[in-house]
């Protein structure tokens, strides 16, 4: 349902952009309609953010999705009527048709703004936390694919099957929008298939809700991690909005006229589509068991490198490859942040949090529209715009690397480990998604910590002798995995440290044998883990590793 909604909105947008350019070229419309449409698309998200968040918390989210689907169909009918007026009065530029069509487009943006918190918030209600990263990867991939396909198909339809077969400007826009009504009907059917959900129980509507933008933002800002996630997501949408307008500018410069502009824009967008789809699916696969925030750094680095190189390779086959890399990086950047924000938001305020995040996203979108328009009007070459955009991405990536060094290194280390060793885990879903958990595992090799970390859906903290921290490489790995230093002469302190970590909601692993196995079987089990579990009041889950005995990391030889 989200896919069809996104496709419909962007299909219409990229029908209206060349329509406006064509009308402006014959004096029946002002220039720069693409910037007006860009603003109209994001302004409802800004002004309606508190109301949309309240709506998603006050009523069952599946009902909000259903109502918005009917509203979208009604608006598409209104837009078709406006375009029909334009066809009927083509000789005088369409008369009142253009203002009516632009108003209908604005209503489509209103519909998307009211729908967004409900469609994002319903994911956790239907799937829970454990599959949130995976679901967000699929959702973001299909949604962005729909956005870009809508833009590509809309532009090609207007150009190839409209103008180039002899139809007038209005007729070239009217026919495809008429067909898109089918997508509106499909959205309604899909919305009725969503399972019923419960309302979060928000307060009754009050006038002050309409203008409480900064109150909702304060909810997000009260949690530093949640606020940084919202800013990161906003940066992605600002980056995407600027890049989109920059590619439209390049298409206009290459063609120099309306003819062929839609196709050229579609050609430039195609590698971005493929990159985002691949990146979203990759993020979904990597985050299948747990949300990997280290991907955010990887995505940011890919975005910055690709965008900087586009400044020097803005034409030819290599430029399309770089656009694909930028798209892939953008998906890897956004998917974990979206999943983290949804998971961290309190259930009773999830709609408000997502709505406040949308407010940030669209303020970034407004800034992107204004900034790119200023760059174009000032005559700034495209290559300099790419360079500035890439430099900004590089700065953000380095900042994220400072914030998330452990997540990034952990992702890289475990990624390399998984590529060398094939690991099959059974029963990992028995580990609770939150709260303290004590894992009790057998100890076969020096790499047991990596095996368990690669298998568990949650980060694990291991008990490790303090002397090990003094070794350069072992100490690095211990800090990377937030190991708890203990002393062999102060056993009581070790029990207290482990218990405190468990009370704080961590997953702690102990090897109760106290040493590596010398035979491949179990050694004597020490009782310290029982004292830890009793003191922390947490569940104990046994973990057994097999197939490692005989490796170079064991005492088999």
Could you say what each language-model-derived stretch is?
Residues 1-16, 37-75, 100-159, 228, ...:
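Substrate-agnostic recognition of the 12-TM MFS/MFS-like secondary transporter fold
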Residues 70-94, 301-315:
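C-terminal ends and interior cores of transmembrane alpha-helices
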Residues 427, 503, 507, 518-557:
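A cross-family acyltransferase "interaction/gating" segment
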């Amino acid at each position: 349902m989200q896919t069809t909604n996104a496709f419909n909105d962007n299909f219409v947008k990229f029908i209206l952009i060349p329509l406006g350019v064509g009308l402006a070229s014959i004096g029946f419309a002002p220039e720069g309609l693409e910037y007006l449409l860009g603003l109209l698309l994001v302004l409802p998200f800004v002004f309606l953010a508190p109301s949309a968040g309240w709506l998603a918390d006050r009523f069952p989210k599946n009902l909000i999705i259903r109502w918005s689907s009917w509203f979208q169909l009604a608006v598409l009918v209104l837009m078709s009527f406006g375009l029909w007026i334009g066809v009927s009065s083509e000789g005088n530029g369409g008369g009142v048709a253009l203002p009516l069509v632009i108003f209908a487009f604005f209503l489509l943006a209103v519909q998307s703004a009211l729908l967004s918190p409900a469609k994002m918030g319903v994911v956790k209600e239907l799937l829970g936390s454990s599959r949130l990263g995976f679901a967000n990867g699929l959702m973001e991939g299909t949604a962005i694919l729909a956005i870009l396909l809508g833009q590509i198909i809309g532009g090609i339809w207007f150009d190839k099957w409209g103008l180039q077969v002899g139809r007038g400007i209005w007729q070239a826009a009217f026919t495809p929008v008429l067909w898109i009504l089918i997508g509106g009907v499909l959205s309604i059917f899909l919305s009725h298939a969503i399972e019923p959900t419960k309302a979060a129980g928000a307060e009754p509507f009050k006038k002050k809700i309409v203008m409480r933008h900064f109150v909702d933002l304060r909810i997000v800002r009260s949690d530093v991690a949640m606020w940084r996630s919202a800013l990161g997501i906003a940066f992605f949408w600002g980056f995407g909005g600027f890049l989109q307008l920059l590619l439209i500018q390049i298409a206009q410069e290459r063609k120099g006229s309306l003819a062929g502009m839609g196709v050229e824009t579609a050609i430039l967008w195609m590698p971005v589509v493929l990159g985002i789809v691949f990146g979203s699916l990759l993020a979904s696969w990597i985050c299948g068991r747990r949300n990997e925030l280290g991907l955010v750094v990887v995505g940011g680095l890919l975005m910055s490198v690709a965008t900087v190189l586009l400044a020097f390779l803005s034409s030819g086959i290599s430029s399309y490859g770089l656009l694909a890399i930028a798209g892939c990086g953008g998906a890897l950047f956004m998917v974990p942040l979206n999943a983290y924000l949804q998971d961290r938001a309190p259930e009773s305020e999830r709609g408000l949090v997502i709505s406040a995040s949308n407010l940030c996203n669209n303020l970034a979108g407004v800034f992107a529209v204004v900034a790119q328009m200023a760059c174009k009007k000032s005559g700034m070459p495209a290559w300099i715009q790419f360079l500035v955009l890439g430099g900004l991405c590089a700065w953000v990536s380095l900042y994220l690397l400072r914030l998330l060094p452990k997540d990034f290194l952990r992702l890289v280390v475990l990624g390399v480990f998984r590529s060398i060793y094939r690991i099959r885990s059974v029963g990992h879903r028995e580990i609770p998604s939150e709260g303290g958990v004590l894992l009790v595992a057998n100890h076969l090799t020096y790499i047991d910590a990596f095996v368990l970390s690669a298998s568990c859906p949650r980060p694990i903290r291991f008990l490790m002798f303090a002397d090990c921290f003094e070794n350069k490489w072992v100490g690095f790995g211990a800090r990377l995995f937030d190991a708890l230093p203990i002393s062999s002469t102060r056993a009581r302190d070790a029990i207290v440290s482990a218990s405190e970590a468990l009370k704080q909601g961590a997953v702690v692993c102990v090897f109760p044998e106290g040493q590596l196995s010398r035979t491949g079987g179990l050694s004597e089990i020490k009782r310290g883990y029982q004292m830890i579990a009793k003191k922390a009041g947490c569940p104990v889950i046994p973990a057994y590793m097999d197939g490692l005995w005989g490796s170079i990391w064991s005492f088999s030889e």
